Amino acid sequence: MISRSIFSKSVSLQRSQNRSFLLTAASAVFGSMIFNENNQLASKMERGELHYDDPNASLNEKKVSPASNKYFSRRESEYPGHVPLYGIEKFMMFIGSGLGSFFHPENNANIVALGESTAIEPVLRKLQRQMLSDPVGRQILREKPRMTSTSLNLDHLRALPKNTLGHTYVSWLDREGVSPDTRVPVRFIDNEELAYIYQRYRECHDFYHAITGLPIIIEGEIAVKVLEFMNMGILMPGLGALLAPLRLKPSQRERLYSIYYPWAFRSGLNAKPLINVYWEKSLEMDVNELRRSLGIEQPPDLRNLRKEYFAKLKKEKRI
């Protein structure tokens, strides 16, 4: 019995020693692993090779929209403010702005969008060739002047002699209550130089009004649009000349068709390319001499014709 008890204690002691050895060995191995890993982490930190995952990475990632894949990638802008459009987008802009321009021609946003959606590349390339083939046109493309009330110095123009282009222009602005600062920048034409050519056309529009004396009432706008279309071939003025009269009164259409359309056809075809006129450098020129040099005849005064028409109506009603 005594020997059995001694043997049992001996076995228990051996087992306890074995467990202690195993625990010690495991602790040593685990500690060595941790120490080795810490050494590796420290080494990586020292070499700049350690990178932790950013928990906010998913929030900082740029959202990828369906339109940004290889089939619908948006082109890069070609100049400040440029908005590249797909063909279908430009077509939808044409439809929307066309309807808006017909029913609400007083909304300038419709006119602007219609103009740029119909400013097709072949027409703009033709104007570009005209400018490149002319020394003044080349100078305009090289210098790229912009027309604002500051660049034109309207106060200086008011002080010029009455027979000058500058005084005629600023007098027309004052009479009609408009400003050269209202011309919005081109956004939807893809080529930078073509965009400038259309911007130039847009900013010169008031000079066409000034040298012809036509007001900004709808009949005057249509007449100037016909002149622009016949001279430069830009589509939007042609569409305006074709469709805008449909909303006019019979008396207005009669004036346009009998007086101002024939004048605009004749002047537009006979005049020199208006896109090549450096208006800013002609401000001190005699306006009548300028008209002759350009080949533009001045049409009958539209406001006077309207006054005469309404006076006649008033007289007939009294009778």
UniProtKB/Swiss-Prot annotation:
Its EC number is 4.1.1.130. It is found in: Mitochondrion inner membrane. The keyword Lyase applies. It is a peripheral membrane protein. Pathway: Cofactor biosynthesis; ubiquinone biosynthesis. It catalyses: a 4-hydroxy-3-methoxy-5-(all-trans-polyprenyl)benzoate + H(+) = a 2-methoxy-6-(all-trans-polyprenyl)phenol + CO2. It is an enzyme of class 4 (lyase). Zn(2+) binds at H205, D206, H209, E221. The keyword Flavoprotein does not apply. It comes from the Eukaryota. Its cofactor is Zn(2+). Keywords: Lyase, Membrane, Metal-binding, Mitochondrion, Mitochondrion inner membrane, Transit peptide, Ubiquinone biosynthesis, Zinc. GO terms for biological process: ubiquinone biosynthetic process. Its main location: mitochondrion. Residues 1-28 form a transit peptide. Lyase that catalyzes the C1-decarboxylation of 4-hydroxy-3-methoxy-5-(all-trans-polyprenyl)benzoic acid into 2-methoxy-6-(all-trans-polyprenyl)phenol during ubiquinone biosynthesis. Component of a multi-subunit COQ enzyme complex, composed of at least COQ3, COQ4, COQ5, COQ6, COQ7 and COQ9. Belongs to the COQ4 family. This is Ubiquinone biosynthesis protein COQ4, mitochondrial. It comes from Clavispora lusitaniae (strain ATCC 42720) (Yeast).
